[in-house]
């Protein structure tokens, strides 16, 4: 009853913004996020702020990707929503969930946690995290595209109006009125992505066959193996922390005098797949004065031999 199927994290975030944000935030209120947010957890709150007259306030980071001292105090009695990434999709940094959540709840704010980058890589317990909402996408964790999840505390979901209207989300329809289905069906209008849900179930079983703690430990081992070698290259600059324990399988970097798209193209020509661009986090890039970067991502199928091949090409760029 607390798990709603959606298309992806973006749709989950929009559901929260429209069904909770627009109905519970007003002029004079604050929405607090970090500057590192994916656009799905940023543009949504821009929209809510614009529509309600609320203020959107940012918590800023130091050069290592940690929250600057005192930024948490921006969460005050006027704050209604605190939304942030569990793990940054650019920096790989895990934000201090416990500290931020306790601060938010102490002033009566709800916590929206973007788990798109964390869920594939570490064990997740929403009760332990004590967030009010949690979202993630299946395609980032070996499921097919087009399936996502929204977790919400039942009392919040029950009080929220539907996001999409139509078939399956109704209880009874008359000419002028309609009543809505129980949870979670109230938020699952139309034909569901049954194939996607089955693929997500299979993906979860697959990942749990290894153990999420084992996957997290293996990725940390991979990062510890390759990160110092990248940092040692004088023409390459890693964004954020250089502590392997703080990268969670993601290393974003720039190369002197070479555009990230060109870096990615050169690597691709050698059979190495990376991501280049702003990674749907333009305010973070602007904050660090980096318009784009190349991102190396590791997962349970990555081998040290793959990283060696990556490094040899990177040396020549």
Labelled PLM ranges:
Residues 1-317:
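Pyridoxal 5′-phosphate
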């Amino acid at each position: 009853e607390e798990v709603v199927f959606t298309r992806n994290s973006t749709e989950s975030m929009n559901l929260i913004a429209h069904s909770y944000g627009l109905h519970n935030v007003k002029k004079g209120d604050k929405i607090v996020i970090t500057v590192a947010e994916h656009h799905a957890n940023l543009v949504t709150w821009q929209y809510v702020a614009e529509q309600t007259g609320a203020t959107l306030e940012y918590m800023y980071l130091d050069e290592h990707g940690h929250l600057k001292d005192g930024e948490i105090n921006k969460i005050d009695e006027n704050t209604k929503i605190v939304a942030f990434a569990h793990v940054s999709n650019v920096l790989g940094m895990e934000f201090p969930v416990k500290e931020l959540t306790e601060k938010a709840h102490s002033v009566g704010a709800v916590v929206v946690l973007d788990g798109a980058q964390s869920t594939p890589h570490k064990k997740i317990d929403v009760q332990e995290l004590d967030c009010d909402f949690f979202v993630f996408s299946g395609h980032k964790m070996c499921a097919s595209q087009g399936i996502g999840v929204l977790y919400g505390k039942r009392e919040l979901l029950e009080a929220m109006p539907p996001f999409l209207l139509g078939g399956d989300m109704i209880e009874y329809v008359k000419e002028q009125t309609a009543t809505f289905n129980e949870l979670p069906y109230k938020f699952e209008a139309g034909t569901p992505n049954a194939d996607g849900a089955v693929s997500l179930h299979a993906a979860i079983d697959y990942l749990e066959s290894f153990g999420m703690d084992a996957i997290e430990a293996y990725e940390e081992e991979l990062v510890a193996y390759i990160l110092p070698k990248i940092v040692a290259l004088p023409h390459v600059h890693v964004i954020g922390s250089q502590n392997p324990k703080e990268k969670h399988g993601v290393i974003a970097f720039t190369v002197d005098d070479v555009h990230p798209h060109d870096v990615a193209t050169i690597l691709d020509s050698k059979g190495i797949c990376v991501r280049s661009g702003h990674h749907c986090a333009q305010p973070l890039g602007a904050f660090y004065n980096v318009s784009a970067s190349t991102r190396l991502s590791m997962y349970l199928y990555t081998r040290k031999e793959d990283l060696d091949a990556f490094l040899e090409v990177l040396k020549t760029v």
